[in-house]
Amino acid sequence: MTVILEAAAGLCLLYYGGIVLSTGFSVSFSLFWPFCAALFGFLAAGRHYYLNHREEIPVWPLVSAVTVLGAAAAVIAVVLVLIGTGILTSTKKSMDYVIVLGAKVNGTEPSNSLKKRLDRAIDYAENNPNTFLVLSGGQGKDEEIAEAEVMYEYLRYNGVPETQLLLETRSTNTRENIRYSQEVIRSQEQWKERVFQQIFKEVGENAYAPGDELDSIHIGILTSDFHLFRAKAIAKKQGVRNVYGISAPSDPLLIPNLWLRECFAILKDKFMGNI
């Protein structure tokens, strides 16, 4: 067991080194890995000390530590399974709206994570020309402009029609992404209603319009694969009934870091009542 703990500590340090060499020190949550390495090293040293001083140390500290770590591992395992179920969601064609969730931007350029989402959005827009894309993302503290504006320019440059794009530039987290995007969708539906009313009024027929309720509207959420479960759960918590997922791939090297970070984000949102 001591050897296993020492090996786990070494793997955590190697993985952290790989992240730093590949992407630098800017990856969020990456310090979790040296912390885990220190924890595994501490446990290995503690077990070694216990084996050499077994008669002097009571059993309850060891039992307590194993119980706590086992419970934490079980919770994380369950959440990881839930994240996996989000990735397996099938994509629906011809949705009315697709909310494209923003991610970090570098100056006026999308980050690698955001670029993968946008490339997926381009593919969906080409195959579903009647679907509106709601580009959702405000301006972060270390960002020059709103994420939605960077997304808009990238999609326009890659041939997505301006008429297919709607912007939401106020949100700073996933909960706000969904909330403010619903407001954009509702405003668009109300505008369509006014247009319908004007058209039918001019031709002298009874007015019919879609109304501003979102119950009958099919809404997709496009985000990174690991993020899809939480995004859909937040949307359902906010009352979005017909919500579907569209996943974009993640950087293979960062998958362990992204998935574990998402575990803690899901637990936090559950505790805060967001899902």
What are these regions (language model features)?
Residues 1-50:
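Membrane-embedded alpha-helical segments of integral membrane proteins
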